[in-house]
Amino acid sequence: LLVLMDTDGNVIRGTCKPSSEMKMHLRVYKENPAIKAVVHAHPPAATSYAIAGLPLNRAILTESVMGIGEIPLAPYAMPGTEEVPDSVAPFVKTHNGCLLANHGALAWAGDAMTAWMRMESIEYYALVSMYTHGLIGQVQELTCDQVDRLIERRTRDGITTGGRPQCRDCGQEGTEACTSCGKNANGDA
């Protein structure tokens, strides 16, 4: 079922017809030449967040903040069209993966093992989020200072992408400054 292709979409090896989703994979490679592997899957917990229209952007797990960062939600796109790669493109240089609205998840990295582990991490993050928010109903999120320290560690460990989760104190995301720490979701003051 695997088809080996070049970055122009030409089949090098394999007898199956490539999926229309190959456009999404190829776009990730073109957007960020450092990416050498892309994993697309439909893991149940992460896909549930994608169907609900919710990104994975809360600072609840130290491992998630350090390892994959926030996982944004790419807007809905019609399968098989250029809308799909266009919806993913804005996240490729700044994040390590994304959810695909009403579809599934996508992870990328400099090698296949790391891309696969990031997909596993996305699903774990989604599953823990479901348990704590839905079943337990109580979440103790990390503070802005704790998130900053984890991001500094992540950067020292060589991971320069991942975004910044929402601030616990005010839930601020996007370009507006947090009323607690003064930073936006990109970590800019």
Residue positions per predicted region:
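Glycine-rich flexible loops
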Residues: L1-A189
